[in-house]
Amino acid sequence: MGVGHSLTQHPLLSVEAIARLAERLPEDRVEHNVADLPKVVDPNAVRQRDEPPGEIARNIERNGCWMVLKNIESDADYKRLLDECLDEVAPYVRERDGGMTEREGFIFLSAPGSVTPSHTDPEHNFLLQVRGTKQMNVGRFPDTETEQLALEQALGGGHRNVNWEPADPVTFALQPGDGVYVHPHAPHWVQNGPEVSVSLSITFATPASQKTRRVHAINARLRRLGLSPTPPGRRPRLDRGKVAGFNAMGRVRALKR
């Protein structure tokens, strides 16, 4: 679903502002790689540059990199920006899905021609194009079994990348001021245009998406034990038991801290 926005000139989304934010964020909240990649790639095969994150951001026009700044809401200014955006859609989400939780923001900074390989993300996501152009290719899983195994991997502690191209992709050609809504877990890949790209991703969870994530996480554990777990949605009572188990494990981890 296409959307529009008015953030193209926002001072917090300039390359220099993003570079300064990259220098402030914890090291594990900034990720990058050299982005001359195919649409499907082993995450262990990507290369990185041995430079500070701020310099990678400032030199994005010529270093061939892709960078993501995660959980930008940990910075007060960016949290205000995130909340301003999500507050506009929160009433509709509350009416349709029962509430909006886990508000998070991500900034993507991409060199000309870079590729973000096929992957999935667990959140409801509005991707807003701020600078440059890109093609967002959103598809589907080829079959139910592939979907189950991929999501168990991603939500059970594995990588978000998938080892196949999304089936029947729909391409969204994004210009500054454009955006697209991406449903949780929808497989997609991204081709950047001929200029530096800046994109803001504003994400959230709902009760239903939280439940699905937790069932997949428990299913991943069950599969490692040699079992063949039932996918979310087929047996609601069993799903409720898995969610209760996930929540109980979270409480145990909290007590151990």
Task: Please tell me what each predicted stretch does.
Residues P112, P122, A186, V196:
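A generic "binding-loop/recognition-motif" signal
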Residues T171-F172, I202, T206-R257:
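Conserved double-stranded beta-helix
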Residues F106-T120, V138-D143:
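Conserved short histidine dyad/triad with adjacent acidic residue
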Residues V115-N125, A167-D168:
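A short beta-loop-beta micro-motif enriched in histidine and acidic residues
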Residues M1-D83, I218-L227, M249-R257:
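Transition-metal
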Residues L151, G193-F204:
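Short, compositionally biased
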Residues S74-I107:
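A gly/proline- and charged-residue-enriched helix-loop-helix capping module
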Residues Q129-Y181, H185-P187:
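Double-stranded beta-helix
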